[in-house]
Swiss-Prot record:
This is Bifunctional purine biosynthesis protein PurH. Gene3D superfamilies: 3.40.140.20, Methylglyoxal synthase-like domain. The IMP cyclohydrolase activity resides in the N-terminal region. It catalyses: (6R)-10-formyltetrahydrofolate + 5-amino-1-(5-phospho-beta-D-ribosyl)imidazole-4-carboxamide = 5-formamido-1-(5-phospho-D-ribosyl)imidazole-4-carboxamide + (6S)-5,6,7,8-tetrahydrofolate; IMP + H2O = 5-formamido-1-(5-phospho-D-ribosyl)imidazole-4-carboxamide. One of its GO terms (biological process) is 'de novo' IMP biosynthetic process. The gene is purH. It comes from Heliobacterium modesticaldum (strain ATCC 51547 / Ice1).
Length: 527
């Protein structure tokens, strides 16, 4: 018995050559409508679908392939039981299916398209065949993209079969194809009905669930909503449980996420305070209370009204410090009952509980929206160890300096570029963010560090906490000016990616000024 292929496509690109190639391999080609006419006109043997179903097309072509002799041939496993049932009903197995769907998107994009035209371009039989073939991909190769014809033909010519790996890949593409198709239809119908949800149709159905409309977006004149990724069960700002406080705002959620992702970096108890998506205080310490006190003292003016994140359970001692100042929200893996009671004294404080951070799978994708499209990249999970850095100066960093360099390197990754972080004794005492030149960010960070009260009177030089501190830069130093500026404030060591054509000038300046410098070979731009 010859093998059978079913071809029914709206996009005729390459279909004649594909059908001819299959026919040359002994396949019986079954087709419908315009595809049948195209293949027949090219002189390729082809059977009209009604010849195998014994049933005519009806309802103006709305029903053509919805028949057991089509779907039975597609869905049958190649087991003795299924094959016996096919034989009993004179059904031939179908091994290859090439289908792409009515051009719904193209139709509704036309100016003046009517609802009737749109509805008539909602494909029914096509998606049914695509999904049936994809479900039975153990036995059937389903092609929804003409670019795949050559791959399938090549494997059939070389091996007589389509490989399991290719069939699985084709099935994934097929389900994505029908999901996108359904999403386009849902978006059109929502818009046509005057749905007042401005975000209807942005996401593919089933990918996300709408949690709530937000009061507004970044600004009061912007509408906003919060969606949660379906299936994600890890600890994150999007899955955290609100234990107390007012409704979350758009900006709250952005800052909660930024704060939580920062404290994930650390194994020791850590606290981070975020304002406008940038850290204004970060610290690690032996206790959470100490970490929070130092993070807050680093820049108490900026910390007011901020978002706090902790990487371990919040205890009563820490909670007592938090409630001394107005804060928007706090997020942590958990809260002791005593800590929760203390924090709830602040009626407006939003308290968010994530569960253990260790339970989370690493983030895999970072998505940004641009007008007319999306940009997708791997999440920035890069880090370096003491063994991986390269000391490039005559003086190597001392043990304490090295610990601070690695701490600052973790923090600077979470600061808007151009980013500079000044750190000392496990505290970020100065942050320069978002400046268009690097020395400008350094100047801001160094002035903040000089004014920091993270160490109070216990500082080596409490009039200049920057003395003896370290500096981290998210990208290479293009000129020696940052080194020279840092040295004037008492910076003793610098960590940066390296890679500038003027690295030698920065290294020479460090050697001249007694500053240690290490290269990571890794950049951490954040836009």
């Amino acid at each position: 018995m010859n093998r059978r292929a079913l071809i029914s496509v709206s996009d005729k690109t390459g279909v004649v050559d594909f059908a001819r190639g299959l026919a040359d391999l002994g396949f019986e080609i079954v087709s419908t409508g315009g595809t049948y006419q195209t293949i027949k006109a090219a002189g390729v043997p082809v059977t009209y679908v009604t010849e195998i179903t014994g049933f005519p097309e009806i309802l103006d072509g709305r029903v053509k392939t919805l028949h057991p002799k089509v779907h039975g041939g597609i869905l049958a496993r190649r087991t003795p039981e299924h094959l016996a049932q096919l034989e009993a009903h004179a059904i031939v197995p179908i091994d290859v299916v090439a289908v792409n769907l009515y051009p719904f998107r193209e139709t509704v994009a036309k100016p003046g398209v009517t609802r009737e035209e749109a509805v008539e371009n909602i494909d029914i039989g096509g998606p049914a065949m695509v999904r049936a073939s994809a479900k039975n991909h153990e036995s059937v190769a389903i092609i929804v993209n003409p670019d795949r014809y050559a791959t399938v033909l090549a494997e059939l010519q070389q091996n007589g079969v389509v490989s399991e790996a290719t069939r699985r890949a084709l099935a994934r593409e097929a389900f994505a194809h029908t999901a996108e198709y359904d999403a386009a239809i849902a978006a059109y119908l929502a818009a046509e009905a005057g749905d007042d949800d401005p975000f209807a149709g942005i996401f593919a159905p089933g990918k996300v669930e709408k949690v709530q409309d937000l009061r507004y977006g970044e600004n009061p004149h912007q509408k906003a909503a919060f969606y949660r990724e379906r299936g994600y069960r890890g600890a994150g700002a999007g899955t955290a449980k609100q234990r107390w406080g007012k409704e979350l705002s758009f900006n709250n959620l952005l800052d909660l996420n930024a704060a939580l992702e920062l404290v994930r970096e650390f194994d020791r108890p850590a606290a981070a305070i975020i304002k406008h998506n940038n850290p204004c205080g970060v610290a690690v310490a032996a206790t959470l209370k100490e970490a929070y006190e130092k993070a807050f003292a680093a820049d108490p003016v900026s910390a007011f009204g901020g978002i706090i994140a902790f990487n371990v359970a919040v205890d009563a001692d820490t909670a007592n410090e938090v409630v001394k100042t107005f804060m928007e929200a706090v997020i942590a893996p958990s809260f002791d009952e005593a800590a929760l009671e203390i924090l709830q004294q602040k009626k407006g404080l939003r308290i968010m509980e994530t569960g253990p951070l260790a339970d989370s799978a690493p983030a895999t994708a970072d998505v940004k929206k641009i007008r007319g499209g999306f940009l997708v990249q791997e999440a920035d999970l890069g880090d370096v160890t003491a063994e991986q850095i390269q000391v490039v100066t005559e003086r190597a960093p001392e043990e304490g300096e090295l610990a601070d360099l690695l701490f600052a390197w973790k923090v600077v990754k979470h600061v808007k570029s151009n980013a500079i972080v000044i750190a000392k004794d496990g505290v970020a005492i100065g942050v320069g963010a978002g400046q268009m030149n690097r020395v400008g960010s350094a100047q801001i960070a160094l002035e903040q560090a000089k004014a920091s009260r993270a160490f109070g009177g216990d500082s080596v030089d409490h009039n200049n906490p920057a003395q003896g501190a370290v500096l981290a830069s998210d990208a290479f130093l293009p000129f020696k000016d940052t080194v020279e500026t840092a040295a004037r404030y008492g910076i003793r060591a610098i960590i940066q990616p390296g890679g500038s054509v003027r690295d030698a000038e920065s290294i020479e300046a460090c050697n001249r000024l007694g500053v240690a410098m290490v290269f990571t070979g890794m950049r951490h731009f954040k836009h």
